[in-house]
Amino acid sequence: REYRDELENDSISVNYLELSSRNKAESYVDSLIKFLKKKKLSEINIFEIEDKSFEEEFLKALKDANVTVNIFKSPMFIFERGEFVSMAKGKKVYRMSSFYQKARKNLDILMDENGKPVGGKWSFDEDNRKKIPKNVEPPKMIVFKKSKYDEEIKKLIINNFDDHPGNLENIWFPVNRAGAEKQLDNFLKVRFENFGIYEDAMLEEKNFLFHSCISPFLNIGLLTPDKVIKKTLQYAEKNNVPMNSVEGFVRQIIGWREFIRGIYHEEGALQSKSNYWKHSKKLTSSWYDGTTGIDPLDDLSLIHI
């Protein structure tokens, strides 16, 4: 709803169907097709759909309804799907490090004039495993003003999704683009310098350390990776941010995030049906109720209950 308001404030006409106004027996795709028929539309433009099962359902339903679908590259990722295939071509196994190096070269990110990685090596990961000293206090998170739709949406969630995991008591994140950009800016100014050195650190009862906490915004499109990388590199150059922090952060976005997306689309169907480790037992209830005896795992389980 915040996004709808943003678009309308930019003088863009928006047709918005609220969940509360939809027939519960009607799927999202059903509602879309009904809308298209009402408006007498036979062609639509969409970005790539990342969820493979939903993509299949969506495209089949639109085809059956005789609606032409024009698909455009997703702005939520840097590379096209086909680029992952070409970058992995000739490899017997998928390796993130190989993909990451090609990505750096193709995008000319953190490369010197001789085509070599800035700093003399591709990864500074070995520098990013320090414990947080007792005298170092992680910065406090920004407290964002609640959306004007906050209470309304919470009631909607309780009424429709009460059996889903999680709770509504710890919503720390902003829900609009301005808030997402503010979160990124705060990370760059307050956390970025120490991101690298403490990247793998953990502190008991601390959910947020020196990480950016922008994954939710990248995953729903409030931030796009190309703009995040551009702003990050500009800030790093201007403020002499340590290379292990710069490279480590860049690697998460153009390396791991793009790599796992590529694996999902190329091998996801096979992986979902395979059992590489030959597991035969179910997880016990302790994994879900936070009683395994493994503190980090139990803490995480309790947070999500």
Give the predicted meaning of each segment.
Residues 27-173:
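Beta-rich, aromatic/charged-enriched effector core domains that present basic-aromatic interfaces
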Residues 17-19, 46-49, 72, 220, ...:
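Short His-Asn-centered micro-motif
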Residues 303-305:
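Conserved small/polar residues in nucleotide/adenosyl-binding loops
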Residues 106-250, 260:
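Glycine/tryptophan-enriched, flexible segments
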Residues 251-298:
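Aromatic-anchored, charged helix-turn/loop surface patch used as a conserved interaction hotspot
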Residues 20-26:
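Acidic-and-aromatic substrate-binding clefts and catalytic sites of carbohydrate-active enzymes
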Residues 1-6, 26-33, 232:
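Histidine-anchored nucleotide/phosphate-binding helix
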Residues 1-19:
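N-terminal beta-strand-loop-alpha-helix module at the start
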